[in-house]
């Protein structure tokens, strides 16, 4: 299916595939090298079952999902679809577009005979780019598991026998055995391409110990010691945040004034 449309709001949605990705924008990265890095990551995932739909109208309105066995997160969710990102922002909010996109994911999951759908969420300031648990609860999702850092794995079962998905132990209790700052990231989120080098430069300029680790392998991502793999920042072994830091925010986090 290349497109689907909803009569209620007259919006059409385009499916991004290996055939059209070079000529289509992908919402979260509309230009420059950020888009190139994200698109390269997507191209490698399409063969693994990744689906990406965006609104025909230009803006931040899209869903990205993949069979859970191929998801770049440390979860056990056999038979599930995992939503990488469901993002509706700015002027796109308030028109029912999220319901359209989630509805298409549910339809697809049923067509594939999947046990259900799962997605990460968090409350309040911890949420950032993760989904709103209140919205997910309204749509029938319930909490399957919770990491020590407060990030939850929510799920929508589609069969009576669906097993509850869960975090792997490494994600349930995120910690590492290294001192200083350690940052794990992937190219799944285009903003890492821009901000990680700038944070690294700022850390070096201020003598702050920072090790950056780009994850480029699914198996490594699926066993990372954090529930979020697109961006996971640790300090002295403890998980700090999955929120992508600007250079200024990172320096403030490190205690640099001014």
Which residue ranges define each predicted feature?
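Short amphipathic alpha-helix that is part of the acyltransferase structural core
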Residues: 2-58, 170, 191, 195-202
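Conserved GNAT acetyl-CoA-binding A-motif
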Residues: 109-127
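Conserved active-site alpha-helix within GNAT-family acetyltransferase domains
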Residues: 123-148
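C-terminal "cap" of GNAT-fold acetyltransferases
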Residues: 148-173
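Non-catalytic, surface beta->alpha helical segment in thiol-disulfide oxidoreductase systems
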Residues: 237-258
């Amino acid at each position: 299916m290349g497109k689907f449309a909803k009569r209620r709001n007259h919006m059409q949605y385009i499916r991004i595939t290996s055939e059209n990705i070079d000529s289509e924008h992908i919402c979260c990265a509309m230009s420059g090298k950020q888009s190139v890095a994200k698109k390269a990551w997507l191209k490698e995932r399409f063969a693994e079952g990744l689906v990406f739909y965006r609104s025909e109208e230009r803006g931040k309105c899209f869903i990205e999902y993949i069979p859970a066995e191929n998801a770049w997160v440390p979860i056990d969710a056999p038979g599930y679809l995992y939503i990488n990102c469901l993002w509706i922002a700015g002027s796109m909010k308030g028109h029912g577009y999220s319901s359209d996109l989630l509805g298409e994911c549910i339809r697809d999951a049923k067509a594939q005979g999947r046990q259900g759908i799962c997605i990460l969420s968090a409350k309040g300031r911890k949420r950032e780019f993760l989904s709103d648990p209140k919205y997910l609860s309204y749509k029938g999702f319930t909490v399957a598991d919770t990491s020590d850092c407060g990030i939850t794995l929510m799920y929508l079962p589609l069969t009576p026998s669906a097993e509850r998905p869960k975090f792997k132990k490494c994600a349930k209790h995120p910690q590492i055995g290294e001192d200083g700052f350690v940052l794990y990231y992937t190219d799944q989120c285009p903003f890492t391409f821009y901000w990680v080098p700038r944070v690294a430069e700022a850390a070096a300029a201020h003598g702050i110990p920072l090790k950056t680790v780009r994850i480029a392998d699914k198996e490594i991502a699926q066993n990372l010691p954090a529930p979020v793999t697109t961006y996971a920042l640790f300090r002295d072994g403890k998980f700090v945040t999955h929120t992508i830091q600007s250079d200024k925010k990172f320096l403030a986090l490190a205690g640099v004034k001014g």
